[in-house]
Amino acid sequence: MKRNLNESSARSTAGCLPVPLFNQKKRNRQPLTSNPLQNDPGVSTVSDSYGSPSFPTDWAWEAVNPEVAPLKKTVNTGQIPASASYPWRSQDSVSKSIQSNAERSQSAWGYRGNNRNTSLRTWDFRPQHKTVSPAANSEFSSCPVNLGAQQQKQFQTPEFPNLPGHKEAEVPRQTCLSKLPGSTMKGPDRASALQAFKPSFQQNPFKKTVLGDIPRENSLKEGTLHQLKEKDNSLRIISAVIESMKYWRAHVQKTVLLFEILAVLDSAVTSGPHYSKTFLMRDGKNILPCVFYEIDRELPRLIRGRVHRCVGHYDPDKNIFKCVSVRPASASEQKTFQAFVTIADAEMKYHTKVTNEM
């Protein structure tokens, strides 16, 4: 891992001593965890393209371990020292340049020493590394924080001078974690985060009020429907036999009534003028002539001697029942027809009584 400077000095070509370069493939790379200082000209800004700005790792290693710094010194990728561009003169000059770089890095760390602790323990930037790294940005992409210049300004400018360096980075991290379901926070930080996002939790009462209005609207609709049912004057089909149909039509002359009768076909179907079909219906001893006009549909096949259901209105002047629908009656209709006739008679009595009083 280490080259001997004596062996490298023995190989001199063209009157210049070769510059000992460190093999970068075998070096132990340090993670880029710290933020660079843009105003300091001595700090390299090569790591800005990675989205997590930091100091070069060789300066950090020299600041922590200054005794092994001369053996691990490499060419700086951000800015090349002035001593590296000239021929090799002596090891003393190299050690002086390394020490000057180490002092410059320490002075760069002392730039923020007015507001924060400048001890070597400040290298524990794990919370800050999580918030600045690209993986963390993808994890907390739902946090409404601008990741551009505002994030760099937030991590570079000390908003809380009395707190350590890593506390400043934990504040936006905790606000982002408060939105996640699996986040765990303790103490006043959790309470402050919950207070910061309190308006988002106040939507549940709004939903409850909205949901609470639905039964009220349903009750209003039911009330309006109930009122409509009371004032409903729509057309109704009156179930009646032939005798009761003639009776109600004679007593209620000014109202158009639509009757429903169940009777037995007592004649063959004959064709008449204007696409009409005539036939006779019998109910006990009462016989009623009927007519059906095939205007929009044809008359279905009727069988003589069977019970049929006829719907239409009665013309007392011509003594004819003008049908609008004729079909064979089902067994259930024949069973319930007598009950329907009783209900219709009661309704018609009430209707005639009200109209006579008016």
Curated annotation (Swiss-Prot):
**Polar residues bias: where?**
1-12, 30-51, 81-121, 150-159
Q: Hey, what tissues is this thing expressed in?
A: Specifically expressed in gonadal germ cells, when male and female germ cells progress through prophase of meiosis I.
Q: Which InterPro entries does the UniProt record give?
A: Spata22
Q: Where in the cell is it found?
A: Chromosome
Task: Cite a GO CC annotation.
Answer: chromosome
Which keywords are on file for this protein?
A: Chromosome, Meiosis
Region annotation (Disordered) ranges: 1-51, 81-122, 150-172
Which biological processes are named by the entry's GO terms? Answer: fertilization; gamete generation; homologous chromosome pairing at meiosis; meiotic DNA repair synthesis; regulation of meiotic cell cycle; reproductive system development; spermatocyte division
Knockout mutant characteristics: Mice develop and grow normally but show infertility in both sexes. Gametogenesis is affected with germ cells that do not progress beyond early meiotic prophase, with subsequent germ cell loss in both males and females.
The record, for PANTHER family, names: SPERMATOGENESIS-ASSOCIATED PROTEIN 22
Q: What does this protein do?
A: Meiosis-specific protein required for homologous recombination in meiosis I.
Subunit composition and interactions: Component of a multiprotein complex with MEIOB and RPA2. Interacts with MEIOB. Interacts with the complex BRME1:HSF2BP:BRCA2.
Q: What is this protein called?
A: Spermatogenesis-associated protein 22
Gene expressing this chain? Spata22
